[in-house]
């Protein structure tokens, strides 16, 4: 699922705080470069924060990663709540969810899915905070399961997992092949599939 992490809304002309800028910069760099290639110095430079100030907010790279996971979690919950608020029927909610898949197709084709890439990388780390990443990926699956259950589907969990697998697989292919149209094609097929339920 795509998302956009930025600091909290501020008054016009007011810059987000250092911690918010660090988390937003970390999310972007982890997405673009990956965990292993991203250093605390890279994050500080991208956030326009003196490198020494990073340690005031985060003692380790793992603390930064935890903050990025928390920010992604907040963004996913916010996106799902907005879909719930704007769409009454489960089918329309699922279709809106699918539209979210293609909202940043160019970025996904260039760098992969922000959530999928992060969760995949964390799953490979020896000292991994994998549980938090798994919980992050479960958010949209659990939400989709609720929608399928509202449609009276007894196989709601399997359908929700299939939906996320279809997106993440399409995101991987779009990124590998550098072709954002893979995501829009997958979205069309998913919408037709939702109509058949």
Predicted regions and their residues:
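Short, basic, alpha-helical segments at the C-terminal edge of helix-turn-helix-like DNA-binding modules
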Residues: 70-76
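Short hydrophobic clusters on alpha-helical segments that form packing/core surfaces
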Residues: 22-30, 72, 101, 167
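Hydrophobic/aromatic-rich alpha-helical bundle segments in the mid-to-C-terminal region
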Residues: 115, 126-138, 149-197
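Helix-turn-helix
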Residues: 21, 25-63, 67
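Hydrophobic alpha-helical connector segments
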Residues: 67, 81-111, 160-163
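N-terminal intrinsically disordered/low-complexity leader segments
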Residues: 1-17
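Amphipathic alpha-helical segments used for helix-helix packing
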Residues: 92-93, 107-128
């Amino acid at each position: 699922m795509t998302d956009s992490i930025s600091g909290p809304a501020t008054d016009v002309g007011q810059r987000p705080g250092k911690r918010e800028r660090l988390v937003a910069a970390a999310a972007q760099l982890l997405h673009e470069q990956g965990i292993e290639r991203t250093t605390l110095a890279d994050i500080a430079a991208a956030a326009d924060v003196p490198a020494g100030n990073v340690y005031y907010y985060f003692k380790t790279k793992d603390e930064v990663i935890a903050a990025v996971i928390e920010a992604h979690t907040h963004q996913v919950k916010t996106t799902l709540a907005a879909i719930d608020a704007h769409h009454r029927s489960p089918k329309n909610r699922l279709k809106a969810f699918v539209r979210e898949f293609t909202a940043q197709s160019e970025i996904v084709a260039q760098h992969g899915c922000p959530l999928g890439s992060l969760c995949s990388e964390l799953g490979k780390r020896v000292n991994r905070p994998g549980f938090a990443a798994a919980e992050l990926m479960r958010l949209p699956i659990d939400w989709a399961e609720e929608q399928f259950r509202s449609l009276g589907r007894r196989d709601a969990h399997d359908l929700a997992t299939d939906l996320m697998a279809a997106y993440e697989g399409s995101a991987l292919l779009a990124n590998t092949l550098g072709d954002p149209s893979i995501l829009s094609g997958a979205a069309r097929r998913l919408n037709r599939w939702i109509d058949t339920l």
